[in-house]
Amino acid sequence: YLEHGLGQKWLGMCFAIFGSLAAFGIGNMIQANTAATAVVESLGASKFSVGLILAVLTALVIIGGIKRISDVASIFVPFMVAIYFVGALIVILSHLSQLGVGIKLIFEHAFTGTAATGGFIGASLAQTIRYGVARGLFSNESGMGSAPIAAAAAKTNQPAKQALVSMSGTFLDTLVICSLTALALASTGVWVSGETGVALTMQAFSAGLPGNWGAFIVTLSAVTFAFSSILAWEYYGEKCFEYFFGDKWVHLYRYIWVLFVFVGSMVKLELVWNFSDAMNALMAVPNLIGLVLLSGVLFRETKAYEMGIRDGSIDKFD
């Protein structure tokens, strides 16, 4: 759409470069590290062994072509979303008396240094917003242009319908799952424990669920979500790489991808987060330019689709 819709190939090339690099942060190393940390915290396994297993499974899918693994992951993800949703609700309801306090905390600290999870005490409003935007972008990828890569591969007679389906991902991910997680952390009070990331979420779930169920649900969810993200982002990154270099060197990208899954499971993430934030922003810039300049086409196609639904000329279930 940047090359053919706008006639600006240079924008498409910029997007392809930044997209192929951003994938190694948001979709590879951070995901692998999250999964490894969850398993280490829950089962006491080493990050080396977890990273090795994750890299082998990834290689079997993207290099070996064993699609059954990715098929199982794609089936398992909705199931795990439902379990995580129910688990988070139970945690919140078990601390219902503190829910109001938790919501108040979220709003009170939204524009203070505390919003940066204690690591940036005294941070300015600009810094807080910067980290909020960066983490929001990481959470739902809105505006990055990653989702259209997957949507473009979908078989549909109505592009507007596919766009609306893609939009639902942001709603489910951010407004539902992330909101429930935030409320669980705030209402249980574990946010002041000093833990971060998946270990903090484990504490919250363990505070509201019996036995080891909390740690089990968070661990399984983290591994499932991380692995599916690794596979999805390999596809995004590969398509960006292919646009710029052609399909001759795609196999090299896949080998490097698998290597970084293993490396990412063991590295300290501060540098990776900084790299990821920068690449995510750079990837979003050409995409947002395209969205603004092609907004007329967007509105026209959406309006035509909605009118077709109303007058019956388009079957919304087709």
Language-model regions, residue ranges each:
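A generic transmembrane alpha-helix motif of multi-pass inner-membrane proteins
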Residues: 127, 249-303, 314-318
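Helix-loop-helix module between adjacent transmembrane segments
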Residues: 3-61, 220-230, 263
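Extracellular/periplasmic helix-exit of transmembrane alpha-helices
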Residues: 87-105, 113, 117-120, 153-156, ...
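Flexible loop linkers connecting adjacent transmembrane helices
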Residues: 1-6, 191-209, 235-244, 304-310
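Membrane-interface alpha-helices at helix entry/exit sites of multi-pass transporters
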Residues: 4-16, 51, 156-172, 247-255
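Select transmembrane alpha-helical segments in multipass membrane proteins
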Residues: 8-22, 52, 115-139, 176-184, ...
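Membrane-interface loop-to-helix entry segments
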Residues: 33-39, 45-107, 241, 273-299
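Helix-loop junctions at the membrane interface of multi-pass solute transporters
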Residues: 136-141, 145-159, 166-167
